[in-house]
A protein has these predicted regions:
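Short, well-ordered beta-strand segments enriched in hydrophobic/aromatic residues
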Residues: 113-123, 232-238
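Short helix-loop boundary/capping segments
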Residues: 174-226
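Short amphipathic, basic-aromatic surface patches that mediate peripheral association
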Residues: 123-130, 244-245
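C-type cytochrome heme c attachment motif
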Residues: 62-77, 101
Length: 292
């Protein structure tokens, strides 16, 4: 029997949009929007400090020269995930049956007022491992950064928020969240963060600066997700304009962009992540949001 769940988040944000703009935002015709194929991979224990350490990561020298993680690894993320998920490297506690990678289709569009981002992927087989997050079988999040003010954001995407002393890393403080070194919303050194949680039926809009904050952003209009058979699709709608802690999006500009999926009731570092990419709004980018 085909299981179909429809989960809608962001009701409060949508009501605010209704009050301010007179109508709910209408999603674009996704059949007319080009999809970018991006393979997420299981990263294990590979924090920012590791990718900068030349004795352990051969790409550290290239990183220092200004090359991006995607320049070297975009075609091998699935293979990287296999090595790490198996415990061959960078994972001291491998989970039997853990999916090494998740291929995702990403689509983007805008209507002059709102940005629409759609993610779709097939549900990997369950590992059978203990559930880390009982409430949420799936979570998906993406981050945006503007201007490369966060060190290495232009090269490493969201990796600048991932540190060896953050919770769920070996020997780390369980209370320490993601953060940016020298992070400051006032100085523009932050990531704009969006997340959708399946079980809680909620969308969140926060930021990562000196610590991660899951709420307080004002750009999110709605987050809607559904599972149709073995396929998930999640659509985020956010205003192009933003308040404090939000990245304001402008036509003709590109932004640092990365995303991650917590699958199989996972939590913390046990997610699948993208490399760093560019989101272009009427501009060049790995993912392009054209006006519809």
């Amino acid at each position: 029997m085909t299981m179909k769940k429809t989960m809608i988040a962001g009701a409060v944000g949508a009501l605010l949009a209704l009050g301010a703009g007179g109508a709910f935002a209408a999603a674009p015709d996704w059949g007319k929007v080009e999809a970018k194929d991006i393979t997420l991979f299981y990263p294990g224990v590979s924090p920012l400090e590791w990718i900068q350490k030349g004795t352990e990561h051969g790409g550290a020298r290239a990183l220092r020269k200004g090359e991006t993680c995607a320049d070297c690894h975009s075609d091998e993320t699935a293979d990287m995930g296999k090595k790490i998920a198996s415990g061959q490297k960078l994972e001291p506690n491998p989970i039997p049956g853990k999916a090494p990678a998740i291929p995702v289709k990403v689509q983007a569009a805008h209507d002059g007022e709102n940005l629409y981002l759609r993610f779709s992927w097939k549900q990997p087989a369950a590992s059978g491992a203990a559930k880390m997050d009982e409430a949420n079988p799936v979570k998906i999040a993406f981050m945006l950064e503007s201007g490369g003010k966060v060190e290495l954001a232009d090269q490493s995407g969201c990796w600048a928020t991932c540190h060896q002393d953050s919770r769920t890393m070996p020997g780390a403080d369980d209370a320490k969240k993601k953060y940016v070194k020298g992070g400051s919303v006032a100085e523009g050194k932050f990531y704009d963060l969006y997340q959708w949680r399946s079980g809680e039926n909620k969308g969140f809009n926060g930021h990562v600066a000196d610590t991660r904050v899951m709420e307080g952003g004002t750009a999110l209009v709605s987050a809607e997700g559904k599972q149709d058979g073995d396929t998930w699709s999640v659509v985020f709608t956010r205003k192009l304009a933003g308040g404090e802690g939000d990245v304001t999006l402008e036509s003709g500009k590109s932004y640092n962009f990365g995303f991650a999926i917590h699958n199989d009731n996972s939590a913390g570092r046990y997610h699948h992540v993208s490399l760093g990419y560019k989101l272009g709004v009427d501009a060049d980018g790995d993912v392009k949001a054209a006006k519809q």
